[in-house]
Design a protein with these regions (language model features):
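Alpha-helical segments flanking ligand/cofactor-binding loops in enzyme cores
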Residues: 25, 29, 211-215, 231
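Short, structured coil segments at secondary-structure junctions
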Residues: 54-55, 63, 160-162, 216-217, ...
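Asp-based phosphoryl-transfer active-site loop
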Residues: 2-16, 214
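Short, hinge-like loop/turn segments at secondary-structure boundaries
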Residues: 54-57, 76-79, 114-119, 183-185, ...
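Active-site phosphate-binding/coordination module
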Residues: 16-114
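Asp-based, Mg2+/Mn2+-dependent phosphohydrolase catalytic module
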Residues: 197, 216, 220, 226-255
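Conserved acidic, metal-coordinating active-site core of Asp-based
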Residues: 90, 94-97, 101-216, 225
């Protein structure tokens, strides 16, 4: 019997137009004795539109940086301020556009070809730097088409930020956050808090920032649209993708 299900959002629970399919919503609603917990890179202010489909009194956000259980925040971890500012300086000097997610909102310095489900607040570089000195920062992200640009960001983080790590939520979207946060570590925190053994937990995801969920000793699964790295790691691969109720198939397989 599963006691906890942790699910990624984009590409997993949500379909390609960022919605929860009707059959999936009904399946989650009918879970009896099992907590369904979103485990996402999004921040709390980016998931409010899901409250009619999932119980948001329990959630993992910011790739494990923010954990709420029974409406109580049980874990909250920001990036090192000096390292965050250094990464912004690197971005400015290389004409990159950082996407900065703080405790209050999503900020950006310009909006070239911006495609996002959340409208950011646009600030000048100086305004953004000043804000980071006052607010906690969960993560700094970059969307880049050029693999060499992404590799350069990786190299900078490795060389200069001892408290920061990076991972990819899509092949061209890199997310930089504190080393003590991950979706997998969040599973450890919640399972210990609720005293749920790992063999009663299911983790579901589709991309590389979900990989840390799959080495925790719990059950694991992915939709057919998942990355090859994820497919090589999980216990069960659905024949269905996120546009065809893969979540329903996965839950039925383990229940």
């Amino acid at each position: 019997m599963l006691k906890l299900i942790f699910s990624d959002l984009d590409g997993t629970l949500l379909n390609s137009v960022k919605k929860v399919d009707e059959k999936t919503a009904e399946c989650i609603k009918n879970l009896d004795g099992t907590r369904f917990i979103i485990n996402t890179g999004r921040l709390p202010y980016n998931v409010d539109d899901l409250k009619s489909f999932v119980d948001l009194s329990n959630m993992v956000c910011g790739n494990g940086a923010y954990i709420k259980i029974d409406n109580k925040v049980v874990y909250n971890c920001f990036t090192d301020k000096d390292e965050a500012l250094a990464l912004l300086d690197y971005a400015y000097s290389h004409d990159l556009v950082p996407r900065v997610f703080t405790e209050s909102n999503f900020y950006i310095t310009s909006t070239p070809n911006l495609s996002t489900f959340v409208k950011p607040v646009v600030l000048s570089k100086d305004e953004l730097n000043d804000l980071l000195k006052k607010e906690g920062v969960y993560k700094i992200c970059f969307m880049e088409e050029d693999p060499n640009t992404l590799k350069a960001i990786e190299d900078f983080v490795r060389a200069n930020n001892k408290n920061m790590v990076f991972e990819y939520s899509t092949p061209r979207f890199i997310e930089c956050h504190h080393k003590d946060t991950s979706k997998g570590r969040a599973i450890d925190v919640v399972s210990n808090l609720l005293n749920v053994p790992k063999d009663e937990i299911l983790a579901i995801g589709d991309n590389e920032n979900d990989l840390s969920m799959f080495d925790r000793g719990c059950h694991s699964a992915c939709p057919s649209n998942a990355s090859d790295k994820v497919k090589a790691t999980v216990e069960y691969i659905s024949d269905l993708d996120c546009d065809h109720d893969s979540m329903v198939d996965i839950i039925k397989n383990f229940m």
